Amino acid sequence: MKEVVVVDCIRTPMGRSKGGIFRNVRAETLSAHLMSKLIERNPNLDPNEIEDIIWGCVQQTKEQGFNIARNAQLLTDIPRSVAAVTVNRLCGSSMQALHDATSGIMSGRGDVYMIGGVEHMGHVPMDFNIDFHPGIAKTAARASGSMGMTAELLGRQNGISREMQDAFGARSHQKAHAAAVEGRWNEIVATEGHDADGILKLIDADETIRPDSTTESMSGLRPVFDPVNGTVTAGTSSALSDGASAMLIMSADKAKALGLTPRAKIRAMAVAGCDAAIMGFGPVPATQKALKRAGMTMADIELAEFNEAFAAQALSCIKQLGWLDTYEDKVNLNGGAIALGHPLGCSGSRISTTLINLMEANDKSIGLATMCIGLGQGIATVFERV
């Protein structure tokens, strides 16, 4: 099978969903901007050679409906002969886009793909028009439809204390802020948005980071999902944000022929299911499957990105994979979704992009990106620098 490499990976800044920088910018516009930027940044690539654009998005309605991948593409100069499709694996959608494109290249269905994802949670809320089948209560726990309650359950199962969660939440903001101050968010491409006064500007910094977050300030917040006995607060949950991310991937042979330098190759991929009531456990079996396919163990992973849906969830998975005592220098070195937010369709390729940048910055060879998925799934990708 063909070797698949990542040639480029970028993202927009993350905007707050409530009256944030992208309050007047549509999801298709954010997506089209990144599609165009990937072409602009890689002039050796003839856009006609792109086989497909695969875009992740969860709430496929309103401005995000009717195949947002194609709608966004039509806002660009990418030839109309290039195809585009939108995929949905809830939180793992854009990582699923990466997996689908990788499989396409490996099986000979084209050499060049553009993948990514978007979610404008300000314009299309996460729970907009959700209508669960009433009969699901017979086959799945009530908590299955409440992501916060699944985090509460998983945290209790794994002994993740309120103090551990508060420290992890503060860590996310502190590390993300340090990365911003030190200019380490080199994956961000300036994107048009509006400041607090409504002035249109090019925005090149995340709006969601709270630099003043501390373990002490986190400890003062009340539990939001289980007010009586709970430990999960707004501060230890992923922020609601708007954003997009994108990657250009191709076969190693095509990259060489075009004179493009690969940044990483895909070593292994996996998805897995778990009980929907502890949906946040999904990264554990997905990671185990991916590592087995790569012929590796967690000892081989030098850096990892765990999507921070909730501190209780991320810490539970880190513990189950044997890293709870050693994760500080390996996991989410620039913070994560607690600080940046979790725009659902965007996050899979966002954490993959962040991981690749961190692997380069820290001269590491093997990295893992993994995330939980609502209703009980997980997805994981193992990357190797080349």
UniProtKB/Swiss-Prot annotation:
InterPro entries, per database record: FadA, Thiolase, Thiolase-like, Thiolase-like_sf_Thiolase, Thiolase_acyl_enz_int_AS, Thiolase_AS, Thiolase_C, Thiolase_CS
Entry-linked SUPFAM superfamilies: Thiolase-like
Superkingdom of origin organism: Bacteria
Keyword Cell membrane on entry: no
Record keywords: Acyltransferase, Cytoplasm, Fatty acid metabolism, Lipid degradation, Lipid metabolism, Transferase
An individual GO BP term: phenylacetate catabolic process
Active site: 91 (acyl-thioester intermediate), 342 (proton acceptor), 372 (proton acceptor)
Pathway noted in the entry: Lipid metabolism; fatty acid beta-oxidation
CDD domains: thiolase (cd00751)
Catalytic activity: an acyl-CoA + acetyl-CoA = a 3-oxoacyl-CoA + CoA
Protein name in UniProt: 3-ketoacyl-CoA thiolase
Source species of the chain: Pseudoalteromonas atlantica (strain T6c / ATCC BAA-1087)
Gene designation per UniProt: fadA
